[in-house]
A protein has these predicted regions:
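N-terminal secretory signal peptides that target proteins for export/translocation
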Residues: 1-7
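Intrinsic low-complexity/disordered segments
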Residues: 3, 23-24
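Alpha-helical and His/Cys-centered functional microenvironments
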Residues: 7-10, 402
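Bacterial N-terminal signal peptides
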Residues: 10-21
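N-terminal maturation segment of proteins
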Residues: 26-569
Length: 569
């Protein structure tokens, strides 16, 4: 799609929408049909990752298929969907229809990003660890009691591992050495980990499945060890270039994340927020002089009990302070101990179960370790006060927003499109709750919030400079470890994850700033008639929508939208 045509298309969408003058209307049938077909295909083909906000429910009997022949078909389907979407008539569209169109455009271009820009199947050895161990991890996260159907799905996925790795070794024609390091790290002691996992499952799985699971485990371990040995042998000949480069990074920002800033602007925004977060952190330390330090919970049982009370208290706080509506149907976000069958693979991603569109009647769960001072960065904060993580991951953060978005009356808007709005909301509500006084009873916890703010500001620097080739993974990890500061393990995990996912680490800080810009514009436009609660309720229901599109839909503000497709100078 040429630059000129992109700008023409957006201007056409805006002009058509302004002519109809409607924000919400009956959902456009052609867009809804396209969305159903596209996301049904993505449920089969979307890669598994370590992230928790883009997990998808798979069809019964699903296994990944990355054979060379299937990759050719996937790339052709991208072209087919792209052509089909662009051919849909735009006559008489509402503003809502135009937003939905741009959402679907973003979703289709993400396929191109994965297959043709990042070239995950050809360049990323860790990709195949997530299509093997990662797909087991996703099933093991589900906290509701094990069923025969889920156990069968687990067995089916175990049995798919040898074929997936066989395809991986054929596909990896331009592998990156740094990504091989990540794969090798994730595969350490893999046979014993899988055995421990399956042995722990025995009490909750029917006895007639034990032998099949044990046999499939050994076959999977054989294949994984063979793959890891192959990687180690091939690594001296692998490329050392992992950065995506400026041109492709800007393509991601404009076409997929729908963020109307260039890399230099992002760096400036991150630097300004770093200055603010460090200053406010210093103010908080001064304010809290003489106060007792936060204590760690004595046990996970005590932490779980406290987190349950805190989650309920946060929900009441939201309503009492008129911050946003808490739907009566919304379930709870609880902590639980890490199950023994999950523990061996807990390094494969975020250890939570945020439920899904078909599980809105279930509680969400975050799995926690025993509390103590030697935990990694985020777990250590929760071991002192569960609320900062409850706010970001649970209520009113990810679980709260995603569950409400899954209940959106418009099916298109129930899907993940980009981390920007979701992580932006998760970060935004942290300071929102601080500013409303939630932490007045435990002042030291405000220091945790400001430490989180420091990290999110630095992530912008790390994301942009990894993408542009200005950081090595080790250099980015050292920068985070020394500057946040944070433990080495978490810093290295973050640097590795962000090297694999350009554009993800900026989403927290930039998404938050976009939300605050929208609120500022809304306050100026509506004056005393502006309702923060009303916007927050809209934001949560439409929380999967990039903020630039929210800005347009909520305020009819088109400046950000036009910037998306203007050539950066």
């Amino acid at each position: 799609m040429s630059q000129t045509f992109q700008i023409y298309l957006v201007r056409l969408l805006i002009a058509t929408t302004l002519f109809t003058g409607t924000m919400f209307s009956q959902h456009h049938p052609d867009l809804q049909e396209f969305s159903y077909d596209f996301f049904s295909w993505r449920a089969i083909t979307q890669p598994a990752t370590s992230d928790d906000i883009n997990r998808v429910e798979r069809p019964v009997g699903w296994v990944p298929d990355y054979s060379p022949e299937s990759l050719v078909k996937h790339k052709q389907r991208y072209q087919d969907f792209r052509s089909r979407l662009s051919s849909i008539s735009r006559q008489g569209w509402s503003r809502s229809d135009s937003v939905d169109y741009l959402l679907l455009h973003s979703a289709v271009e993400r396929v191109n990003w994965e297959l043709n820009v990042l070239r995950l199947p050809e360049r990323n050895p860790d990709f195949y660890i997530h299509q093997t161990l990662g797909i087991l991890f996703e099933l093991l996260l589900i906290h509701s009691p094990m069923t025969g159907q889920r156990a069968q799905e687990l067995l089916t996925r175990f049995r798919s591992i040898p074929k997936t790795l066989e395809h991986g070794m054929k596909n990896l024609n331009d592998p990156v050495s740094a990504f091989a390091d990540i794969a090798l790290s994730n595969g350490i002691n893999v046979r014993n980990k899988l055995r421990d996992c399956v042995n722990a499952l025995k009490p909750v799985v029917e006895p007639n499945m034990h032998r099949g699971l044990l046999n499939a485990t050994e076959d999977a371990a054989d294949a994984l060890e063979n793959y890891l040995n192959w990687l180690a042998d091939e690594q001296p000949r692998m490329s050392n270039r992992f950065s995506v480069g400026r041109e492709q990074y800007e393509y991601f920002l404009r076409q997929i994340a729908l963020i109307p800033y260039d890399p230099d602007q992002l760096l400036l925004m991150g630097a300004q927020e770093w200055d603010r977060s460090v200053s406010f952190y210093e103010y908080e330390l001064k304010r809290n002089e003489g106060l007792a330090e936060s204590r760690y919970f004595r046990s996970s049982k005590a932490q779980i009990a406290r987190s349950k009370r805190d989650e309920i208290s946060i929900r009441r706080f939201l309503e009492r302070k008129d911050i946003m509506s808490v739907p009566v149907w919304l379930q709870h976000y609880n902590n639980l101990p890490i199950p023994p069958w999950l523990a061996p693979l807990s390094h494969m991603g975020v250890n939570d179960d945020l439920t899904s569109e078909t599980r809105l009647n279930e509680n969400a769960v975050s799995y926690i370790p025993e509390p103590g001072p030697n935990l990694a960065y985020f777990n250590r904060s929760s071991a002192q006060d569960p609320r900062p993580i409850i706010i970001h991951e649970g209520v009113p953060g990810h679980y709260f927003q995603m569950a409400i978005s899954w209940a959106n009356k418009n099916p298109i808007r129930r899907h993940f499109f980009d981390s920007g709005p979701i992580e932006g909301i998760g970060f935004y509500v942290e300071e929102l709750m601080l500013q409303h006084g939630l932490f007045e009873d435990r002042p030291r916890s405000r220091e945790i919030i400001y430490s989180f703010m420091r990290l999110r500001a630095l992530r912008v620097d790390v994301d942009v400079k990894l993408a542009l080739g200005m950081y090595s993974i080790e250099g980015a990890a050292k920068f985070l470890e020394e500057t946040v500061p944070m433990d080495h393990e978490t810093a290295l995990w973050e640097a590795r994850f962000f090297s694999l996912t350009p554009g993800q680490a900026i989403s927290y800080q930039i998404g938050k700033l976009q939300i605050m810009s929208l609120i500022a514009d809304a306050r100026v436009e509506f004056g005393d008639n502006f309702s923060l609660r009303h916007y927050h309720d809209y934001m949560m229901e439409n929380g999967n929508i990039p903020i630039a599109l929210q800005h347009w839909e909520y305020l009819e503000e088109t400046n950000d939208l036009l910037k998306l497709w203007q050539k950066h100078k």
